[in-house]
Amino acid sequence: MKRLHLFAFASLMAVSGSVFAAAPVLNVRESVTVHASPDVVWGKIRDFDGVSAWHPAVAKDQIIAGSNNMVGAERMLTLRNGGTVTEKLLAYDARHRRYRYAIRMGVLPVSDYVATISVKAAGLNRSKVTWTGTFKRKHVAANPPANADDATATKTMVGVYRAGLDNLKKIIEAP
């Protein structure tokens, strides 16, 4: 009888574990080469509250806590579709031209999101901008509904990164 109870308990734990299994950590890494010096490119993206100047999906950004480019600052992005995303600056390194931030809340289908954007030299008067992020899908069920799965979260973030990087290149390289 004791074995039967242990078996039932183990079976229940296995089933409940699969229903509430932790979503895997997902990664996105996108980059673009821009025909401009790293200082010029960094000048365009360096302000934590300046995303709307180069990302086409962001209509407005504003600091809602702390000070621009200071660790701990929070910004609210208002997207062109009306949605909002609140982000917190985790690290800022002007010397190495990079910053790291986390999404605190918002309309994107991700959770536990942390990203870094950086600019490095890529030859004479050329720069490589790299945007990397780690995150989980927002929906926590082991079998999420369609459009709430890992593929949707990854595809969304690739789209966000590509739109921003491609527009940044276009703006900087425009005659």
Where are these regions (language model features)?
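Bacterial N-terminal signal peptides that target proteins for export
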Residues: 1-8
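Cleavable N-terminal signal peptides
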Residues: 8-9, 19
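Hydrophobic ligand-binding cavity/cleft-lining segments
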Residues: 19-67
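Amphipathic hydrophobic-ligand
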Residues: 24, 109-116
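Glycine-rich portal/gate segments that line the openings of hydrophobic small-molecule binding cavities
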Residues: 33, 62-109, 126, 163-175
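Stable alpha-helical elements in mature extracytoplasmic
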Residues: 37-38, 44-50, 85, 153, ...
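A conserved amphipathic terminal alpha-helix motif
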Residues: 128, 135-175
